[in-house]
Amino acid sequence: MTGIIVVFTNKDNATNIRNLLARGGMDVIGVCSTGAQAMHYADTVDNGIVVCGYRMKDMMYTQLREYLPDSFEMLLIASQDKWSSGDVEGIVGLSTPIKVYDLMNTMNMMLQSMDRKRKKRKKESKNRDPKQ
């Protein structure tokens, strides 16, 4: 199951984004304001997407990305100047102010990409040589 976790310092922002995603038919498993809480939610699902801002109460988005399993992607919502130079793998950026249309399209694109990766991993595990 692909879970979506929304992490913003401002609880109202997190709730608003959760509501937008829920109206779009996406399953949001958690809304929180710290990276530690996001890690707790991440432990409850196999893979997912973390939607977050540049800074949480206890860590930066790059630290959270390092702590997340490889099966998780991150959607960073921040002004363009806050993004790193794109060196961190697994992070998609969306510049503020965001439009609902852009948010929904980006999330759908990320979910489809994750589904393709999951199917590919499943197919590879079935085609493994039993002698390995």
Predicted segments with their positions:
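Conserved sequence signature across two-component system core domains
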Residues: 7-8, 32, 50
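Conserved phosphotransfer microenvironments
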Residues: 14, 35-39, 48-69, 79-82
